[in-house]
Amino acid sequence: MLKEFQEFISKGNVMDLAVGVIIGAAFGKIVDSLVNDIIMPVIGAIFGGLDFNNYFVGLSSAVNATSLADAKKQGAVFAYGSFITVALNFVILAFIIFLMVKAVNNLRRRLEREKPATPAAPPPADVALLTEIRDLLARR
């Protein structure tokens, strides 16, 4: 059983998937930082200097705090600012992945166009012999 597992893990597809997951997780952190540290502060400055992560609506009258962390301690909240930030993360990540896939597809198409045409394989010996016999008979 251990040998089967080792064979499964050593297959190329599994290793490629593992590398993809690790790189994807690291790339996700980069996108999170881009959105949280660069894009959202600019958007927040445009809309009055507020942090989007602190945009919320209290779902009960007991919630009267001004920060999301304090509001969550007081009761249920609808934290739409956090959702906006996460949705923006997703859109940026999806767009970057789209651009990467598009670039890879374009590269594959270009390589296929530039690939020289492979010469046709010679016919099998019996077919070549029959063709030669046919040609000799046609000349008579």
UniProtKB/Swiss-Prot annotation:
Pfam families, per the entry: MscL
InterPro entries of this UniProt entry?
A: Mechanosensitive_channel_CS, MS_channel, MSC/AndL, MscL_channel
GO MF terms listed in the record are:
mechanosensitive monoatomic ion channel activity
Q: Which GO terms describe its cellular component?
A: plasma membrane
Question: Any keyword Signal?
Answer: no
Q: Which cell locations does it reside in?
A: Cell inner membrane
Q: Which UniProt keywords apply?
A: Cell inner membrane, Cell membrane, Ion channel, Ion transport, Membrane, Transmembrane, Transmembrane helix, Transport
Where is this protein chiefly located?
Answer: membrane
Q: Quick check: keyword Cell membrane in the entry?
A: yes
Topology relative to the lipid bilayer, per the entry, is: Multi-pass membrane protein
- Residue stretches spanning the membrane: 8-28, 30-50, 81-101
Which proteins does it associate with, and in what oligomeric form? Homopentamer.
Family classification: Belongs to the MscL family.
User: What role does this protein play?
Assistant: Channel that opens in response to stretch forces in the membrane lipid bilayer. May participate in the regulation of osmotic pressure changes within the cell.
Output the NCBIfam families linked to this UniProt entry. mscL, PRK00567.1-4, PRK13952.1
Protein name per Swiss-Prot or TrEMBL: Large-conductance mechanosensitive channel 2
Its lineage reads:
Bacteria, Pseudomonadati, Pseudomonadota, Alphaproteobacteria, Hyphomicrobiales
The coding gene here is mscL2
